[in-house]
Amino acid sequence: MDVITTHVNADFDCLGAMVAASKLYPDALMVFSGSQEKSMRDLFLKTTGYALPFTRLRDVDFSDITRLVLVDCQHTSRIGRFAEVARRPGVEVHIYDHHPGSSGDIRPSGGEIRDCGSSTTILTRKLMEQGIEVTAVEATLMMLGIYEDTGNLTFPSTTPEDYAAASWLLERGANLNIVSDFVSQELTAEQVALLNDLLKSLRSTPVNGVDIAVAHATLDHYVGDIAVLAHMMRDMQNLDAIFLVVGMGERVYLVARSRIAEVDAGAVMRVFGGGGHATAAAATVRDQTVIQVLGRLNRLLPELVNPVRTAADLMSSPVITLPLATTITEAREILTRYNVNAMPVMDGERMAGIISRRIVEKALYHGLGNLPVDEYMHTEFLRAAPDTPINAIQDYIVGQHRRLVPVFSGERLVGVITRTDLLRYMYTGTQRNAEPVYDLGSENLPVRRREVVHLMNRHLPRPTVAMLRDLGKVGDELELPVYAVGGFVRDLLLGAENDDIDVSVEGDGILFAETVANRVGCRVKSHAKFGTAVIVFPDGLKVDVASTRLEYYETPGALPTVERSSLKMDLYRRDFTINTLAVKLNAEGFGTLIDYFGAYRDLQEKTIRVLHNLSFVEDPTRVFRAIRFEQRLGFPISRHTENLIKNAVKMGFLDKLGGRRLLNELVLILREREPVKAILRMSGLGLLRFIHPDLVLAPNTLQVLDEVKKVITWFDLLYLGEKVETWVVYFLALTSSLPDEGFWGTCTRLSVSEHYREKLIDMRVHGEQVLEVMTRKAARREDVRRSDIYFWLRGLSPEVLLYIMAKTRSDEVRRYVSLYVTQLRGIVTHITGDDLKTLGIPSGPRYREILDRVLTARLNGEAATRDDEMRIAVRLADSA
């Protein structure tokens, strides 16, 4: 195993060099040997758009390391636990360091140590020489290393190679805006004076609902790095957008910085002949005064600043409503069912008012449950339109303590904005303004929306990406928002393969699927009751399509009732936060990741977390799903979620779980790559008793389960091309300690179909009987012929054969089964019943008896040819 590491208290040069080294050693793990500098920690805290592929120190098996790659370090005293690895005989050590005068105590067998501004430069040159490309994200991280160790390419130690490396990285998309935000710079006296002048002139003006800050100054000499001042003023004053206009000699310099999508700094600067990104840009104007440039800027801003976000951007649709005649008691049930705190009340098609949970609870307290909601609903409310600015809605909800704002198109109710919607919007805005959150893969986006097109292009086959774009185009034609959702998106972010593509449509999912089928010429199977469909493409790829919907549960453990809903409500009904991500597929915004519930954070923290505290009460099968995801992904269940599981077990909610649903979850667990770990977790949480009251994970049962994995691996390596239902083998092993009555009871509890129940019982009974016979023979060391083995095991399925091998403690019995599977199972006689017929033997049971006797001879080496078999058949016929 290869490992890339660096010195303790790592800095940006360490980070950049490690990233570069990972391109030269693509199979290596990147591991920090210890702590990092504060600037590094800040980077990891603020960077949410890209999962940096580092392995935790505690997850490394040091005994497996065969090659150690050290960057920016040559001393064992600075690499923590990796020192013993570097000293271990047989370990190959490569060092890349830019301190040639610092001879260390490690004798490298490879790498490069030479004088230049940064270790990252050395490795960047290697990539340039070998023609190895890097992504924009990698280029940015590497540029951070070069800039930090060369003082933004100004230290005396800086070499032409550092400039060349920086140029190469810039050509590959290195983002200098991010670099400048993380590499600290000291202000000169001239910059401090200019900063003071700019702060005095700073004015903020609303433009299209957006506050735009503009500051200006005039100098008779040149002062460099105005961009640094723009960053400082933006942070000091907590500004969304700022424009600096500074006259120096015969030129006017403009610098723009923006944190919000409504202001595209690059677009504004391009009008002045400059350029840049949406978040950072600059321009230089000749032959004009500062006053002239300010005037032109003020005239341009209303044209170039996009209007602030409106109600249409924030509202949830379709709307869940209450009829006017709904009673207070019924209203409480409906508010609880949909997990909302306020709901519009409708008089036919007209909205008559709003009822809140607080009013409902108070009315019930006073014994008014039988009265209709129109007696106590709010009848005065803001009537927002789709184009109502968010700040007006914010003033209403916050200023008047309202829970809900309805949105109307004319007189038709088209959506609602809840207090939660507004808080989430305000939270993302505050997070963005107070402290930048960086998406290294794109531009400084809000916390809960990110661009993941680069991940789609990196991890998905090209035909799949093209297909997803085509789905978005069909959505555009039908004016339907279309999203990839769930586990497919989760695994996309994790870089894991997942061919199960789920698509949610805000609207008629069946119409969407049928339209796709007509466009592409593929098959579609619809389920009108649930609003779902499956699209089967000509190449065999399947896409599951569903109308966005919500679910509610009449009683704990019951099957859900389904209704049409919005994307947000559709995602809220899911089991865990990590499965609530969506990626937009429509052309406008293709590849935008939507995260309502902090799923991205939980993916980064590797945590399984439910969305609400009643999740396991509503659907106890989620308990088993939590364990399955925990073991598959290696993500621990959060402490709070585990406490909720224990509560569901204690309160007996799993007793109400239907057998078929429990069986489905158990089968999925037993089909996992490491089901024994999940079974151990189930045992630890007291879940096995819900399968059968007497089912426990005794030591002998655990031993059988461990053996199952070994025998399945053995069988797979035979390459027989035979499919084995591995879950059946694990199921037989899990229940091996139960008596026959207990096994039958388990099948009944799990509502196994009558046909399959008989099949499982037959497997169990015959398997145990054969195992007992073979064990007895082996224990007595009786002479066992090949034919004995054949007839003992003939007719048993591969699942039963593997179960026998796993359960037996006898090596001799394992040899019997192995011999049968590898040599005996396929042996048949040369002669058939037709040959017996030519001998004049009447058809009937005698045929099977003779053919079995002939087969016995063949198995035992007493009949090698067809003629040998015919002679035996004739002899048996004559003796009859």
Swiss-Prot record:
SUPFAM superfamilies on file: CBS-domain pair, DHH phosphoesterases, Nucleotidyltransferase, Poly A polymerase C-terminal region-like
Family classification: Belongs to the tRNA nucleotidyltransferase/poly(A) polymerase family.
CBS domain ranges (all copies): 315-373, 377-435
Binding of ATP, residues: 487-490, 574-575, 579, 619-628, 632, 661
Gene Ontology biological-process annotations: tRNA processing
One Pfam family cited in the UniProt record for this chain: DHHA1
Top enzyme class: transferase
Protein name (database record): A-adding tRNA nucleotidyltransferase
Record's catalysed reaction(s): a tRNA with a 3' CC end + ATP = a tRNA with a 3' CCA end + diphosphate
NCBIfam families found in the cross-reference section: A-tRNAntase
Single GO term (MF): tRNA binding
Organism of this sequence: Geobacter sulfurreducens (strain ATCC 51573 / DSM 12127 / PCA)
Source organism superkingdom: Bacteria
InterPro entries: A-adding_TNT (IPR053794), CBS_dom (IPR000644), CBS_dom_sf (IPR046342), DDH_dom (IPR001667), DHH_sf (IPR038763), DHHA1_dom (IPR003156), NT_sf (IPR043519), PolA_pol_head_dom (IPR002646)
E.C. number(s) listed in UniProt: 2.7.7.-
Residues annotated for Mg(2+) binding in this entry: D500, D502
Cofactor dependency: Mg(2+)
Keywords: ATP-binding, CBS domain, Magnesium, Metal-binding, Nucleotide-binding, Nucleotidyltransferase, Repeat, RNA-binding, Transferase, tRNA processing, tRNA-binding
Protein purpose: tRNA nucleotidyltransferase involved in the synthesis of the tRNA CCA terminus. Adds the terminal adenosine residue to tRNA.
